[in-house]
Amino acid sequence: MNPANYLYLSALLFTIGASGVLLRRNAIVMFMCVELMLNAVNLAFVTFARMHGHLDGQMIAFFTMVVAACEVVVGLAIIMTIFRTRKSASVDDANLLKG
C-alpha cells in the first residue's frame, strides 16, 4: 500500500478525534477521542519512519503509547471520581476539582 494512504488515514483519524473533542461534552467520549488523536499521530510517525528507513518514528510511537497508557490510568481515575460524586460524566461538572 502507498505510504500516502497511511498519511491520509492518519489525517482522517486525527480530524475525527479533534472534532469529537470539540463537539462532545461527555468526558469518556472526549477521552477516547484524545486517544484516537494520539493513535493517528503514532500512525504518522511510523509511516514517516517507514518511508525514510529509520527507526526513530517507531521509537517515538512506542514511547507515546507508554505515556498514553499512563494517561489512561490517571484520566479514568479522575473521570470515575467525578462520576461517583456527581453521578454524571459531563465535563461541565469538572469544576469540582477546583481548590
From Swiss-Prot:
Q: Which family does it belong to?
A: Belongs to the complex I subunit 4L family.
UniProt keyword Membrane, yes or no: yes
List this protein's GO terms for biological process: ATP synthesis coupled electron transport
Q: Which UniProt key words apply to this protein? A: Cell membrane, Membrane, NAD, Quinone, Translocase, Transmembrane, Transmembrane helix, Transport
Native source organism of the sequence: Mycobacterium marinum (strain ATCC BAA-535 / M)
The protein's matches in Pfam families, at most eight in alphabetical order, are given as: Oxidored_q2 (PF00420)
> What assembly does the database describe for this protein?
NDH-1 is composed of 14 different subunits. Subunits NuoA, H, J, K, L, M, N constitute the membrane sector of the complex.
Leader peptide range in chain numbering: none
Tell me what topology the record assigns in the membrane. Multi-pass membrane protein
State its location(s): Cell membrane
Q: Which InterPro entries match?
A: NADH_UbQ_OxRdtase_chain4L/K (IPR001133), NUOK/Mnh_C1-like (IPR039428)
- EC top class named in words: translocase
Q: What superkingdom heads the lineage?
A: Bacteria
Query: GO molecular function: any one?
Result: quinone binding
Q: What is the protein's given name?
A: NADH-quinone oxidoreductase subunit K
- Outline what the protein does: NDH-1 shuttles electrons from NADH, via FMN and iron-sulfur (Fe-S) centers, to quinones in the respiratory chain. The immediate electron acceptor for the enzyme in this species is believed to be a menaquinone. Couples the redox reaction to proton translocation (for every two electrons transferred, four hydrogen ions are translocated across the cytoplasmic membrane), and thus conserves the redox energy in a proton gradient.
- GO cellular component, as recorded: NADH dehydrogenase complex; plasma membrane
The reaction(s) annotated as catalysed by this protein in its Swiss-Prot or TrEMBL entry are:
a quinone + NADH + 5 H(+)(in) = a quinol + NAD(+) + 4 H(+)(out)
